[in-house]
Amino acid sequence: MIFKKKYIALAAAFSLAAASVTAQPDADYETVVSPDDESTANDGKKHYFTALTGAAVTSTGIFLWNKYMIGAGWTQVTADYVAHFYEHEQSWDKDWFWTNFVLHPYQGALSYMAGRSANLNRIESFGLATLTDFAWEYFCETNAPSKNDLVYSSVGAFPVGEMMYRLSLEADQIHYLMGYTLNPERIWSEFWTKQKPRGTTGNIYELALSFDLGTSYARTSFGYDLGNQYEVFPVFASPKIAIVYNDPYGHDSNEPYSQFNLDISFALGAGSGRAMKEMDESFFHDIRVMSDGMLFARAPAIGETASTLGLVFEYDFIWNNLIQLSSLAPGLAFKQRIPFEKSDMEWQLHGAWLALGTTQYDYLYRGATETPNSLFREYSYTTGAQLVARWKWKSLAGQALAFDLHGYAMYDFADQEQDFADTGWELLGLLKASYELPLSRRVRMGVKDELYVKKTLYSEVEDIFLVANTVSAFAKLQLK
């Protein structure tokens, strides 16, 4: 019952945030028209059949692939199982971390984009993603309907789907295949409607590609007689793309996600050689998706500054040898740019309700205790609070000094507890500091230091304290 109330409250918050959009005229949301093909002009009409069939075809394709190509056991549903769907009890599932918190939001985002590509508004597209997710959980799997999937594949579909939908239109300016890659649902909608989705282009405010080389050191203080574990990951390489969609400062809009930040990175390197888990001995990996988007924004006039105040939504994902973290968190944000004669100073402060998140249960994830014989997950589902604080100084010559703090106060609630795990508070902080110098108008070099700290306050088992420091040098191509 607690889960249902939280889910309904979160869904209602999204509906209210999007309601202002449907009440506003679409004057600032123009149609994308191909310069060499007037047939692509959008008629503005809602194509519900195209949206429903697009979402259904995608879900059916995913189901058939898993059933016949992979032979997944969970796809072996029967007519009797489907007929008694109302008897299926929900549970917190134990799927692979990547599957639950990247692939499921992406699958939901496909349904969301099927709606948006057929001119449905955000509420309708969110409803389509929710409907598709419900059908998947109750009719397409023999597993118990997953509580976390019902959130991440619907609510999580909104930020992922809206960002990809908007970036797909921007990618058309490079090549139409890039647009289809970011939003595959356009293939279906454009085939039937003979028109491109609605939206504007030219909204990319900043776009940067960077490449890091670095090293990482960690110390974990376990309870009981396990003592301290020291690990050194000697070298890793990490490509990254950073996108700022519209200027974060002085932004005024009723359009959800008319301004957002999106950072995606992947790292691979040498393992520590002495980890408790064999894989960590050989390889270092780090995959991150860090984002925040404005749901509603106003630009208050405060002196000579460019300021933004409004509702924000945070979607974060981190998965590496030391961390398993995800968050869906709506909240408030204030952003401000202060101009000086030869430089600018920018700062942001976000405070959010962490509606549903995860963090690794270190005793299992780090292999510190014996692995249970039954099916288990190495992470705990959480709720709590999230804080984002940013500060940046940049000169007109191109130098930049920046600090970025992501803080999480996560509570492992009892409803999701596993028999061999524990509940309690887990406090996490991720602080990054960087400095960069320009080599040319587009190329920059810099250094970065990242400090990760985690302290647990468990109810019954002994607490854990983890500190990790990562140092790297990077080259950046500032495309915009």
Language model: regions and residue ranges:
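Small-polar-interrupted transmembrane alpha-helices in polytopic inner-membrane proteins
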Residues: L120-T142, S154, F158
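N-terminal targeting leaders of membrane proteins
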Residues: V21-V102, Q107-G108, R116-S117, R122, ...
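Intrinsically disordered, low-complexity segments enriched in Gly and acidic/Ser/Thr residues
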Residues: L349-W353, F376-V443
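Outer-membrane beta-barrel architecture
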Residues: M113-A114, S238-V244, M290-F296, G331-R337, ...
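Cleavable N-terminal export/targeting peptides
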Residues: M1-D36, D172-Q173, K480
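Alpha-helical transmembrane segments that form the membrane-embedded catalytic/substrate-binding core
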Residues: Q107-G108, C140-L169
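Outer-membrane beta-barrel "beta-signal"
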Residues: L209, G214-A218, F465-K480
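Sequence/structural signature of outer-membrane beta-barrel proteins
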Residues: W136-P145, A218-T220, A267-K277, E314-L322, ...
